[in-house]
Amino acid sequence: IGTTVPALAGEYFLVTGSGKYFRNVSIKPEDSICMIELDDKGENYRIVWGLVNGGRPTSELPSHLMNLEVKKLQDPDYRVVYHAHTTNIIALTFVLPLEDKVFTRELWEMATECPVVFPDGVGVVPWMVPGGREIAVATSELMKKYDLAIWAHHGTFAAGKDFDLTFGLMHTVEKSAEILVKMLSMQPNKRQTITPDDS
């Protein structure tokens, strides 16, 4: 699997296949996703169901597993890691400084629910080649502090206790990013905003 995750040894995971389209998951799940089981050391996997026409789990498997291990060691109720190519977040990585504090503040200002949904903020990983160990390590370091990490020019990783919370976190961050993108396209400077004293 490209990494070692002993805290996840022997566990099962449902993951998408590499190169598979998410829209096909509901149409042909047996060809688009798979259930994997990790060995007793957390170093290898075997496919126990799915990918019936061949294939491999997502190329981001090391990142998914390392992130989940970090979160589960903090709180055993964490069980979902979700990765998506969030369009507006990606756009912002081309114009905002790639700093946790800057992204957090800008996203918090766009919608009042943001400080409630992600009170610890968001982390930002600078551009790295996806699918490798380096980006997995960088992301898992951020997951020690945040539930959401942004990959510059690529997408977002979110972690949570169930699918609804995890998808909701990512959706809230992406919605806030969409508001910011629209605001920046109309006027680069805010005329009024939510200040830290207001929240």
Role assignments for model-derived ranges:
Residues 1-199:
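Glycine-rich flexible loops
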